[in-house]
Amino acid sequence: MAIKLIVGLANPGAEYAATRHNAGAWYVDLLAERLRAPLREEPKFFGYTSRITLEGEDVRLLVPTTFMNLSGKAVGAMASFYRIQPDEILVAHDELDLPPGVAKFKLGGGHGGHNGLKDIISKLGNNPNFHRLRVGIGHPGDKSKVVGFVLGKPPVSEQKLIDEAIYEAARCTELWFKEGLAKATSRLHTFKAQ
């Protein structure tokens, strides 16, 4: 099944743009830039969108302008309008359980406490079987510090690692369309920025 919608999760507004919780949007922004397809605000989809062609496949890009916990509103609207099935969607999000410098593809699973994923699962009819790109941001080490951590900006050294992982993820996304998910996954999962 080809991917028809790539989503980058984020909170809207300049004050959140550089926070760890917006790592998914950094990836979609990079894809849009690499493929010369600038994102434009499209109110009916509650987000910034663009249309790209990857290996002959028509793909939509989406960065919701809702707050993170309402991401499903944007994803659901676009999936419904274009008749896109959950397994044709790739959602990029920040991942506490991976260190900065690592990104991994995954199909399905729970939301792991991520409010963006939780809302998307709910708005897709409680179907969790969409693809994810998990962008490692690391963990603060204490559950009570998670909210402040994801809404904080990474130090320059960590930002560099996250950016490198996102670059590799963008290259591997293009590889996925060229040579399949298995090859793309194998390459991405052996990458670790130094």
From Swiss-Prot:
UniProt GO molecular function: peptidyl-tRNA hydrolase activity; tRNA binding
Residues reported in the UniProt entry to bind tRNA: 16, 67, 69, 115
Top-level EC class: hydrolase
Site (Discriminates between blocked and unblocked aminoacyl-tRNA): 11
Localization of this protein: Cytoplasm
PROSITE patterns referenced in this protein's UniProt entry, alphabetically: PEPT_TRNA_HYDROL_1, PEPT_TRNA_HYDROL_2
Record GO cellular component, one term: cytoplasm
Site (described: Stabilizes the basic form of H active site to accept a proton): 94
Gene3D superfamilies per record: Peptidyl-tRNA hydrolase
Catalytic function, reaction form: an N-acyl-L-alpha-aminoacyl-tRNA + H2O = an N-acyl-L-amino acid + a tRNA + H(+)
Enzyme Commission number, as recorded: 3.1.1.29
Assembly notes: Monomer.
Function: Hydrolyzes ribosome-free peptidyl-tRNAs (with 1 or more amino acids incorporated), which drop off the ribosome during protein synthesis, or as a result of ribosome stalling. Catalyzes the release of premature peptidyl moieties from peptidyl-tRNA molecules trapped in stalled 50S ribosomal subunits, and thus maintains levels of free tRNAs and 50S ribosomes.
Protein name: Peptidyl-tRNA hydrolase
Species the sequence originates in: Salmonella heidelberg (strain SL476)
Lineage start: Bacteria, Pseudomonadati, Pseudomonadota, Gammaproteobacteria, Enterobacterales
